[in-house]
Amino acid sequence: MALQTCVVIRHVAFEDLGCWEAELPRLGYEVRYLEAGVDDLSPFRTADLGIVLGGPIGVEDAADYPTVTQEIALIKDRLDADQPTLGVCLGLQLMAAALGARVGKGTFELGWKHIRPTSVGLVGPLRRVASAPMFVWHGDEAELPSGAVLLASTDEVPVHAFSYGRSLAVQFHPEVDPATFERWVIGNMVELREIGVSVPEFRAEMQERGPAAVYASLRLLRAFIAGL
């Protein structure tokens, strides 16, 4: 049986699928990355599953980074056609923008947060992450788009996950595992120093919380795919 296609838009090389990368083929998907701003992104439109990962740019940066406008248009096409799409962090923000919601500077979150599913979220894939703190790192946030269903919040940010048809968007980072984390702290060294983060303490938190988060994240992914 042929694998289905999973096309992933990646904004920086060190922000990849993390713990999801090995799991997606087991769930029946062949993964192909497209590099934002470099590759032709049109294959994303017709993929069986589209995933949009995070990155340091934002919806408000479209004037400097034309890929933002292109991605929003491609995502809108997929959402209008109810093609399964999964957005992570920036991916959530781009999905929200594609649905006409406001996206901009918001509450800065960095570290481990309890993701609090709504009553609707508790009967879907988001229930899988209710028991373990998940990793967050973002400064922008989105309002809930019209027609979307709110699935989860944190104490500080009201829209941490929503669904729209067969698509799912999450503001937190379920894909992060220890190897991904290590690439992130190297790639974001300047920002971490500027905001006074102790990398050894940050790493120790990952070592403590990472295994439970990865376990919950894989269950989230499996539940999402099973529901398509």
Task: Outline where the language-model segments fall.
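Extreme N-terminal starter segment of soluble prokaryotic enzymes
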Residues: A2-V7
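Short N-terminal binding/cap micro-motifs at the start of the first secondary-structure element
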Residues: E15-C19
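Acyltransferase
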Residues: V176-L228
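Pocket-forming structural segment of enzyme catalytic cores
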Residues: L99-F181
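Catalytic nucleophile loop
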Residues: R78-R102
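Flexible gly/pro-rich beta->alpha loop and the following alpha-helix that scaffold active-site loops
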Residues: A22-L86
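Glycine-rich His-Gly loop
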Residues: I9-V12, V52-P56, G139, F172
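Cofactor-binding loop segments of dinucleotide-utilizing enzymes, especially the Rossmann-like FAD-
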Residues: I9-H11, A36, L90
